[in-house]
Amino acid sequence: MSLKNWLLLRDIQYEGTFYKKFPHVYNIYVIGFIACISGLMFGFDIASMSSMIGTDVYKDYFSNPDSLTYGGITASMAGGSFLGSLISPNFSDAFGRKVSLHICAALWIIGAILQCAAQDQAMLIVGRVISGMGIGFGSSAAPVYCSEISPPKIRGTISGLFQFSVTVGIMVLFYIGYGCHFIDGAAAFRITWGLQMVPGLILMVGVFFIPESPRWLANHDRWEETSLIVANIVANGDVNNEQVRFQLEEIKEQVIIDSAAKNFGYKDLFRKKTLPKTIVGVSAQMWQQLCGMNVMMYYIVYIFNMAGYTGNTNLVASSIQYVLNVVMTIPALFLIDKFGRRPVLIIGGIFMFTWLFSVAGILATYSVPAPGGVNGDDTVTIQIPSENTSAANGVIASSYLFVCFFAPTWGIGIWIYCSEIFNNMERAKGSALSAATNWAFNFALAMFVPSAFKNISWKTYIIFGVFSVALTIQTFFMFPETKGKTLEEIDQMWVDNIPAWRTANYIPQLPIVKDEEGNKLGLLGNPQHLEDVHSNEKGLLDRSDSASNSN
């Protein structure tokens, strides 16, 4: 098989678009990997700080920032991401998902340049804010794009590529940062931060060669392009394929339903009909932060300092959890579509609070005060004595096990889930608000955690353990199952108001809708529906084809 055939490369001219001169790739896995490079950038950001905060060259060059200042530098990226997430839907809904991904790449590159060239704390913060805005665009647009373009049976796998890219980005840049520790002077962090531009450049180029979201095109009455894209992804270009026609009919009927509520705004997310989805989406992203994982990522060097590890030993030990994060995410890409979202999230929550309480218990029992801090850092106020290796190893093992259960559950599951629960009309703004919530709590934790480590030390883990208990309970009672359902069926499941714990085997019966002439189009999700629409001479698909031909 040639590379062109494997990529499903098609030289299709799309009228009236900036991207019409470029051939497009229709291999859904390649599409997903390109769109989710924004996740790689997110991971690069996390590791770019965690690999540098313990180095003397970083501390000396940036005037030995205290815990509050360091929290501000770290949080500046999340602050920019929060802003970018809220702005993103205005571009994504008006100009397309691809435009948002291009803005993501452009802002990220600009921010990386400023960070690489930073002369002081202020310039570093400005660069991180701009890069953060890019990540805000990407974290809102990429999961939405992947959920809208993927066939239902593999939607979890494709959408999960975003989180997989995050884990790869963390691991890759951490090891780059570790290698740069052996370089003298400011070049150590400048090379590390400068290399952040690479995924931005790849995304900038790659977006030209992926198709637009068919659901976005349908919402903008561009049916010919919608048909071509769905056909090329699902059936190698066969527009008459039964599965292709069925997906197009689902999209068309959802567009009819959505057309009754144009100009959907953020305030509409809090109306009675939409509020349950909004609560679930916002709380899911909130819990992903409050479970403590990003604390493990941003501040892993501090954690291992508490366990008695210093210098290169600390960095090497810290890097293992980044490898585990990648390795444990890979099987989840395929298993989440087999076992479902709810079981994965609930089991993950149970094990996460187990290991958080384990870390807290070991540190509370075996650590001793460390006046003046550890290794010159007053943020770390306790340490396990060097002779107590069993306790130190217990902290390390619990940290690793936490990562092993977070990665395949709340790591990958939430970005998939929040891109599925909203309908076409709500999806851009609903996903953006959910992502903005993630970034808001990311910002708050980046500011809070250094001070928490300094003032309450091991009790910090008790707080995150309690949060993990709470998220497990809410997941059981409020998070419906979305596995194997079309996006349109998921929307109807909310309308039917089925208890979350009964949704795994529930098959929604979508309401009868009519075309503009009053003809019934049948029940969406009902096997008879396909025959109803095919036999209806005035169905929307035939009328849209006629309209295209007349034009």
UniProtKB/Swiss-Prot annotation:
Task: Give the glycosylated residues.
Answer: N388
- Which topology term describes how it sits in the membrane? Multi-pass membrane protein
Keyword line: Glycoprotein, Membrane, Sugar transport, Transmembrane, Transmembrane helix, Transport
What the entry lists under Gene3D superfamilies is as follows:
MFS general substrate transporter like domains
Residues in compartment: Cytoplasmic: 1-27, 92-98, 145-155, 212-289, 337-343, 417-432, 481-551
Question: What is the documented function of this protein?
Answer: High-affinity glucose transporter.
The family this protein is said to belong to: Belongs to the major facilitator superfamily. Sugar transporter (TC 2.A.1.1) family.
- Under which name does UniProt file this protein? High-affinity glucose transporter
Q: Which gene underlies this protein?
A: HGT1
